[in-house]
């Protein structure tokens, strides 16, 4: 009711809906839609800078880097020295300082080319023993930084079984076989000579018993090292190893020295040669003859058992 003076005048649609689009009449009486202004705030300078930085050309960054500094001798030489030093340390550790736990872990490339330094932990017989590999010796930290285990549980599966090359000592009782004369003397001598000492074993080959055949040296007096097998021959507590196959001396020169030492001990009647020098040739038996006789007797016993079972 327009005549009522208190009536409110009609509101402008453009003010009531500011977000809606408006129409403008052009001269040719055509209506053109004009988008309404946005209520969003204008972007800040920080937003603009982020957008600009994200769209930056990375090629320009690479080109802007001064790569000449990486080709200068003052950069290349130290880098090459550090890299080469690291690779050299890794090579030395893998080849010389890595500990070998057992004979089965020795690489075939070691045989006749390399030697192992270790500490003797036990002596099993007159011509074999076990040693704990200590690569590098004292320079590798052993004895003052790294300790060699002493307990049986600690040493289990962690020692190398070594067979002395070129010699054969009297047999101790084992596998049901009786002890051979002078076997205890040979075992006691070897125990006193090398047990608890550091030895160096020059490796030749593995044998059928899981041992490694080697010429072993021990330092008894200052810097003078002694061939353990050769010393046993000189004391008459072993013979030169005699077999049809598998004989290992480590060279013609060592074999010559071994045979001369055996002949000298035999002539002087030392150790096990006492019985032979005393004229009891029939009672004397070499370790090789003893093994052959024991094998023959065991074979006869097996054959006798087989015949008895058939009956």
From Swiss-Prot:
Question: What UniProt keywords apply to this chain's record, in alphabetical order?
Answer: Calcium, Endonuclease, Hydrolase, Membrane, Metal-binding, Mitochondrion, Nuclease, Transmembrane, Transmembrane helix
Region annotated Disordered sits at 1-53
Q: Which GO molecular function annotations are given, in alphabetical order?
A: endonuclease activity; metal ion binding
Indicate the segments forming the TNase-like domain, all copies: 114-275
| UniProt xrefs under Pfam families | SNase (PF00565)
Membrane topology recorded in Swiss-Prot or TrEMBL: Single-pass membrane protein
Q: What is its EC number?
A: 3.1.-.-
Q: Which residues bind Ca(2+)?
A: 168
Return the SUPFAM superfamilies for the record. Staphylococcal nuclease
Q: Where is the active site?
A: 163, 171, 211
Q: Give the location in the cell.
A: Mitochondrion; Membrane
Biased composition regions of type Polar residues, renumbered to the chain? 11-31
Q: List the disulfide bonds.
A: none
Name the family the entry cites: Belongs to the LCL3 family.
Instruction: Output the PANTHER family linked to this UniProt entry.
Output: EBNA2 BINDING PROTEIN P100, SERINE_THREONINE-PROTEIN KINASE 31
Q: What is this protein called?
A: Probable endonuclease LCL3
Q: Which organism is it from?
A: Coccidioides posadasii (strain C735) (Valley fever fungus)
What is the phylogenetic placement of the source species in the record? Eukaryota, Fungi, Dikarya, Ascomycota, Pezizomycotina
Its gene?
Answer: LCL3
């Amino acid at each position: 009711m327009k005549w009522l003076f208190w009536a409110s005048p009609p509101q402008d649609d453009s003010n009531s809906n500011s977000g809606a689009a408006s129409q403008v009449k052009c001269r040719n009486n055509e209506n053109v839609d004009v988008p309404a202004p946005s209520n969003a705030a204008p972007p800040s300078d920080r937003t603009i800078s982020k957008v600009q930085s994200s769209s930056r050309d990375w090629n320009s960054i690479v080109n802007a880097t001064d790569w000449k500094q990486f080709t200068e001798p003052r950069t290349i030489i130290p880098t090459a020295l550090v890299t080469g030093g690291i690779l050299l340390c890794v090579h030395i550790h893998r080849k010389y300082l890595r500990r070998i736990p057992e004979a089965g872990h020795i690489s075939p490339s070691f045989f006749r080319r390399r030697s192992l330094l270790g500490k003797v932990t036990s002596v099993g017989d007159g011509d074999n023993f076990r040693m704990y590999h200590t690569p590098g010796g004292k320079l590798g930290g052993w004895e003052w930084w790294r300790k060699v285990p002493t307990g049986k549980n600690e040493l289990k599966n962690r020692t190398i079984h070594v067979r002395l090359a070129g010699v054969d000592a009297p047999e101790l009782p084992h596998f049901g076989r009786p002890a051979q004369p002078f076997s205890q003397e040979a075992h006691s001598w070897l125990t006193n000579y090398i047990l608890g000492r550091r030895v160096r074993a020059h490796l030749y080959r593995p044998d059928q018993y899981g041992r490694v055949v080697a010429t072993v040296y021990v330092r008894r007096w200052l810097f003078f090292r002694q061939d353990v097998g050769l010393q046993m021959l000189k004391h008459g507590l072993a013979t030169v190893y005699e077999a049809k196959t598998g004989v290992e001396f480590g060279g013609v020169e060592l074999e010559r020295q071994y045979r001369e030492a055996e002949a000298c001990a035999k002539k002087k009647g030392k150790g096990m040669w006492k019985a032979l020098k005393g004229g009891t040739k029939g009672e004397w038996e070499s370790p090789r003859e003893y093994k052959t006789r024991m094998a023959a007797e065991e074979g006869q016993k097996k054959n006798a058992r087989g015949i008895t079972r058939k009956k």
